[in-house]
């Protein structure tokens, strides 16, 4: 086959034999042994803060062992969450709301109360008599009004 290129060069398909690459071996570098290079672990950390002129804000930070994120409205109410790795290796997660009604939190690190409901308290005879006398006096006062 005779082939002519768009630029006017002509050649035969026999001259297009596949090129055979010779194997290449890389010699070890006499200067650096990659196995002997110590690489320090990288602790990537980031933080952010954005706020407008009326006080609304969003802010937080993240690194290898802890994170925090919060948003705040113009009235100062905040909603956020944070997490960290405890000394025991447990990931502690906390969500919170801070507003006019107080600080409200939910976390996997809070203690859990007992699941057994205690028996009701039974009044002693003296307490039962005092309650009855008190209620009798209350009814007498109500009758006068």
Swiss-Prot record:
Keywords (alphabetical) are: Cuticle, Repeat
Which Gene Ontology molecular function entries are recorded, alphabetically? structural constituent of chitin-based larval cuticle
Stored InterPro entries: CHIT_BIND_RR_consensus (IPR031311), Cuticle_Struct_Prot (IPR050468), Insect_cuticle (IPR000618)
Q: Does the keyword Repeat apply?
A: yes
**Which segments constitute the Chitin-binding type R&R domain?**
41-114
Tell me which GO cellular component terms the UniProt record holds. chitin-based extracellular matrix
PANTHER family from the UniProt entry: CUTICLE PROTEIN (PTHR10380), PUPAL CUTICLE PROTEIN EDG-84A-LIKE PROTEIN (PTHR10380:SF236)
Q: What is this protein called?
A: Cuticle protein 7
Q: What is the lineage of its organism?
A: Eukaryota, Metazoa, Ecdysozoa, Arthropoda, Hexapoda
């Amino acid at each position: 086959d005779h082939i002519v290129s768009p630029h006017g060069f002509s050649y035969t398909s026999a001259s297009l034999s596949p090129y055979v690459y010779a194997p290449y071996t890389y010699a070890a570098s006499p200067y650096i042994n990659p196995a002997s290079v110590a690489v320090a672990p990288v602790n990537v950390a980031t933080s952010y803060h954005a706020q407008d002129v009326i006080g609304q804000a969003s802010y937080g930070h993240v690194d290898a062992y802890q994170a925090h994120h919060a948003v705040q409205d113009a009235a100062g109410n905040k909603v956020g969450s944070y997490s960290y790795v405890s000394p025991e290796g447990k990931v502690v997660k906390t969500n919170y709301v801070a507003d006019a009604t107080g600080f409200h939190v939910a976390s996997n690190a809070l203690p859990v109360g007992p699941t057994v409901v205690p028996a009701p308290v039974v009044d002693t005879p003296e307490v039962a008599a005092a309650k009855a006398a008190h209620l009798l006096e209350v009814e007498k006062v109500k009758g006068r009004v």
